[in-house]
Amino acid sequence: PEITVTGTKLKNGMIAKVGSGSFIWPVPNYKYVSRWMGNGHRGADICAAYGTPILASDSGTIIAAGWHYSYGNYVEIDHGNGYKTLYAHMSAQAVHVGDVVEQGQVIGYVGNTGNSFGNHCHFEMYYNNALISARNVFPDM
């Protein structure tokens, strides 16, 4: 049997957008990461001013957009090539489930929602449903 997490599988009628597999940093001009993945922390915390646009790291389809007790306002993108990315603690989302987005498109805005202490974008990356470190994809950050 196939096991999926609710909200992470394309629904009937949704068209998958396949990403390039080449990622861009989701918060341009903000390079400071206060915390990388490790010790129970699942992503990179990119410090930025409240309301700063958050960009899709690659093209794909929005598979989740909503509220989570820990993530606050968040968006998840399926890039259709085994990769998924998740962006959390947004002040607001700019997309909805089922939307097809292009690399560099605004998907939301930096905030401080959910289990958060200060404005930042929490950024997670997955390959074949396994969590991977953004530090390996962006070694110069």
Task: Give, region by region, the residue ranges found by the protein language model.
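Non-catalytic extracellular/periplasmic "stalk"
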Residues: P1-S20
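Catalytic cores of peptidoglycan-degrading enzymes
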Residues: G19-M141
